[in-house]
């Protein structure tokens, strides 16, 4: 009822819109502003043609792990195109839609990052104007006429400046030319000379390797204006989704057709403002002016290539584009980080910093100062920019400052190192590697090479490649499955340390961190002295040289050594007084009270050196989040499974946590869901986490205290969530029965809110009685929930298709194949485990129903075909013929039906397939001679066709390939007659 009313209301709005005189989109003299161009597009489709205005989706894809960023206007509507939209959702009611979508193309399949700045058109962020018609609301004629009306009558583009293209067809796939679209353009008055046809590469759009697709028509603008040869740029692409690309490459017609159009706002504005470059429009000119005013560089002049002396204009374009991308992404919740989309954004920011400082000589804080200009130009269309402007500027400025500091330190290291080099010496690879380490200075290697090039020094690239390979091998060795190559102190080394009187390592500084009111953690540095050094082979040495991997013993450290299931810290150390040279620390191991740091020495290091240690904040925070989450998970399991539930082990790193629990069976779907809800409740309350060392004997007073079968130090550290440790130790306290209280030496959050969320993504039984759970937290957990929701919608859509019934076998097989694909996705996707179990149960039931439907259709088809064959072969003991069959299963059923209705007849049928293969099935009569077997009969025929056969004395089947079916049928008849 609601959908019908909405459709009626839409028709009424469109009728009113057509009856009202259309107002020009700009009454002001001069070229239109970019904002007016955007507004005119949206209002044209909304007010005149009854489209629903849908806000832009965030650039962070929702429930689509295949994308780093939203890179096209159609991304948010993929559930409609794929038929997976939730029928209860608002999107299910979309019929005709218009919007302006924020898009980012940097990383992944569509990556324009390295092209930005080099020419006058590429952008990492752009706006895609689009209108859509779903389910056949309208199609080619209306889409083309509306586009032509908007461009020529509203925007006022001269018709003689516009060219169009259409799909010329494809002989390989059997697709005919899209003459319908051609004729539409001709009927709209486009001269035949400006209506061009192209093949599938230019004018056939596909979503991916499989999925909806169809011919498209492009509208091009002639920059030359009829003077000389045309200079065409694509303006608008109108896609007519009417096909579906199957996994085998074949095309099927879609049950519902859709229109998907896209026109880049930046290019459209350039055309309407009479500019050759998008950077010359008012979408960018405020930014370019602000850059000029802040940097004092020569004004932007639009030069490229060799004409752009000093790469000044290139830098202008890079900075203007990248600050837009950064602002939009951060406003949408994507911040610079260390993996995935955040890592790409970090590259974008550092690329902008490089050009602004190295080329434009911009002052510190420059990039952050441009954020208000971005808000001014885009904020009216995307209010989230203004809402988050302070956050955006702060994050940009912080990362800019961090990178500038890294650059300054890097330059000093390079200067000092270069002074030591001879005239023909190469720059040491180990120093360059130290500069480029992710998480420390983080200077891209190409920038290191550029800085060296400016000094006339070449980098030891061969050595750098060796270090990269060595580091990759070492990281692989650090994996859980391969631990044997780690530096470690054996019993002899420990004895020697004791003999020399070297004290064990004081690692209490690892707990030296604070939580600020804004939610940020601060980790203090640690001053220490080198007490002992070990070579890569484990031999004690007095010093190590440049490029050597080594082990260090210090008198004290703030690094957490791997223990208690928590991965060790990473970071770096510097010699006191020589802050510029970083010694990367890959990990720390606890060996008999001594903490051995695994490091790479970029230059000489010796016993007695004073050093300062810095932990990798992001890595440490990741471990703290996962460790606190592990405690909450342990408590939630006890709340769900009972107070006697025991932990049997755990391991965590910044990416995920693993938890082994004693259970006789795997957790049920409801238990998994309950465990997560307990954790979410505590996280949502942002409870404080208390940590305190107490005498080991006192911990015996705590009823319900969680501890493992380990030897604990005395005093021991108690970690309590929401309840002060002193209160938990009280004689009458029941705190540990109602919250998480554990003995633990790990590093933890100071409040639970930073966990964000927890999702159990995997469950398996290690051995009888022990279940292993895998879990993730924070944004990863939220993403898993989004993917799970998206997959659930796809399964619901498949269920709906199954309920509607299949008209024919091909459709039934497609549905069965789709259910099989969903089953595979549900098995491997990173989604909540409880949801995986629910989906697998549903999909198993759907697959059974789909198979039943296929068997029913096959039986009906077999009955029909067998009756036709009996009419044609009413006499004689033999039926040898061809028949169309969708599969070998159908062909076998036809043969059996024939023999059931005529037991005295022997039957062999061949069925040619579109792929060129030939299916074969046969059955001999009940009274056939003992020498006449179905298997031998099928083998004789299939061998003739260059194939194979299998079966029994009574029934057999096979496959082959032949261009001469009559010859194959002749072979079948001759063999059978020889046996009768």
From Swiss-Prot:
Entry-linked Gene3D superfamilies: 2.40.30.130, 3.10.310.40, Bira Bifunctional Protein, Domain 2, Threonyl-trna Synthetase, Chain A, domain 2
Binding residues annotated for Zn(2+), in chain numbering: 627, 631, 744, 748
Presequence extent in this chain: 1-23
UniProt-listed PROSITE patterns: AA_TRNA_LIGASE_II_ALA
Record's keyword annotation contains Ribosomal protein: no
Top-level taxon in the UniProt lineage: Eukaryota
Binding partners and assembly: Monomer.
Function: Catalyzes the attachment of alanine to tRNA(Ala) in a two-step reaction: alanine is first activated by ATP to form Ala-AMP and then transferred to the acceptor end of tRNA(Ala). Also edits incorrectly charged tRNA(Ala) via its editing domain. In presence of high levels of lactate, also acts as a protein lactyltransferase that mediates lactylation of lysine residues in target proteins, such as CGAS. Acts as an inhibitor of cGAS/STING signaling by catalyzing lactylation of CGAS, preventing the formation of liquid-like droplets in which CGAS is activated.
Name the UniProt record assigns to this protein: Alanine--tRNA ligase, mitochondrial
Annotated source species: Mus musculus
